[in-house]
Amino acid sequence: MSKADIVVGIQWGDEGKGKIVDKLCENYDYVCRSAGGHNAGHTIWVDGIRYALHLMPSGVLNKQCINVIGNGVVVNPDVLISEMAQFENLEGRLFISDRAHLNLNHHALIDQARERLKGDKAIGTTGKGIGPSYEDKISRNGHRVGELLEPEKLCENLMKDFELKKTYFDVLGIAMPSYDEILKDLKRFKEVLAPYITDTTRMLWKALDEDKKVLLEGAQGSMLDIDHGTYPYVTSSTTISAGALSGLGLNPKEIGKVIGIVKAYTTRVGNGAFPSEDLGEDGEKIGLIGKEIGVSTGRKRRCGWFDAVAVRYTARLNGLDTLSLMKLDVLDGFESVKICKAYEYKGQEIDYVPCDLENAKPIYEVMEGWDKVAGIRDYDLLPENAKKYIKRLEELSGVKVGYISTSPEREDTIIL
């Protein structure tokens, strides 16, 4: 029996998981999404063409891969159908768990209305309705993908739900959709998605029993984890490696190696603590060179320096075996680069992540910059200062770097 490997983001998301999964999946038979929804965005560049994925696993660009959307994902049928239209011959290559929960239009309307009402205390959600979808799931009022196979019955149940929520909808200023509108959409969803809906847990058990190679693709980042992230400025799912197990129906004995994806600097979308954020020229420069615009939201990402304290924390949470260092080329040309090696917290220097991270200030180590790493595919050809930077990140995080990305292109990846 084979074991599944996991790729997980270990900052605040947007680390470059899509590129590394796309690179790795040529060695895997299955690539699987386990959590989140279309709030997560993966960008992949192949031969100069940009692909933006939100629900589809990143293995879809490799035709030998079978792609699985697991039970832990919340699926918006409209978004998924739109993404599927970019690709040909998906039957037999894409499967959706019948146990995955649905994300529908009213979830997004609730999300957006609540954010407006919170004003300056808004979480900064993507407005895609992911939180409300998970709320319905946890309160046992949700609906699952498998229910799309009986659209009339699902429509009746949704109308009953809406009637119960009528007062809440009125407060938020949301108009209740009509039965006919909903049924029309549900029938369309069934027509397109029915061939792809199945029990993906049993499928993966069988694959592992047959020694197939399986890669689990995390969404978002560990610092956004519902339990271990910067609460309440977090997502609504478990984004650490443990979540990949429940999100696909696997057990701990079925896991092989865990690869942590990390940028050579740090970014964050939305509100919440970010100790190493740089609000000056360097932060602006990083964002400009790195094209730090959210794939799902179109919002500018906040930018700052590598936070080794946070990475060491998430490395332990995830049980990392190796790091994949992304976007090293973005730091090309900086005279010096900084690493947050510790925090100043309530008058003391600490080397851990407190639950009130907003009260921590960065303590930096400054290193000399380098000229250019962009496009380099051989570690020995990297500038010495870039090598010193990588080595220092390994020392501070406690994890060896196994992959280095030097451009958005698939092939510009150093494998150590």
Swiss-Prot record:
Residues engaged in binding Mg(2+): D14, G41
Keyword Nucleotide-binding found: yes
Binding-site list for substrate: V295, S296, T297, G298, R299, K300, R301
Residue numbers annotated as active site: D14, H42
Top-level taxon in the UniProt lineage: Bacteria
Record CDD domains: AdSS
Gene Ontology terms, MF aspect: adenylosuccinate synthase activity; GTP binding; magnesium ion binding
Pfam families the record matches: Adenylsucc_synt
Residues at which GTP binds: 13-19, 41-43, 301, 327-329, 405-407
Compartment list: Cytoplasm
Alphabetical GO biological process terms: 'de novo' AMP biosynthetic process; IMP metabolic process
Name the UniProt record assigns to this protein: Adenylosuccinate synthetase
